[in-house]
Amino acid sequence: RVLTRKNDIQQTNTLTFGNTALNTETFELSAPGGSYKLANKEYQTMLLFMRNPKVVIPSSRVLENIWDPDSKAEDNTVWTYISYLRRKLEAIKADIEIRTMRGAGYTLEVRK
């Protein structure tokens, strides 16, 4: 019983997609090739994608969800953070990627 409860707790703290996991308590992104502890904005961006896999998310939605409305963040800020995450996903040999959907936004997909 204790093991079952412990496993339930671990599952609620981790989002998985493909071979990649995001721990919502430690901000750790992991896959078979290793792991990274993400910075706050990287974590929030990755969390948005992990909660909405295969959904096209416009950069305006990323901005609204993660940055303060009074901040000076723009679309190029989102692009920068997505580029950081893409590099980290590649480095840990994740089988998922953040794809650009030209004119629409970004989506988290399993690599083909």
Stretch-by-stretch model annotation:
Residues R1-T16:
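Basic, amphipathic DNA-recognition helix from helix-turn-helix-like DNA-binding domains
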Residues E28-E97, R102-A104:
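Positively charged, aromatic-enriched patches within helix-turn-helix-type DNA-binding elements
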Residues N13, A21, E97-R99:
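N-terminal hydrophobic or amphipathic segments with adjacent small-residue motifs
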Residues K37, L108-K112:
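Intrinsically disordered, low-complexity protein-interaction/activation regions
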Residues E25:
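Short, ordered coil/turn segments that flank beta-strands lining enzyme active or ligand-binding pockets
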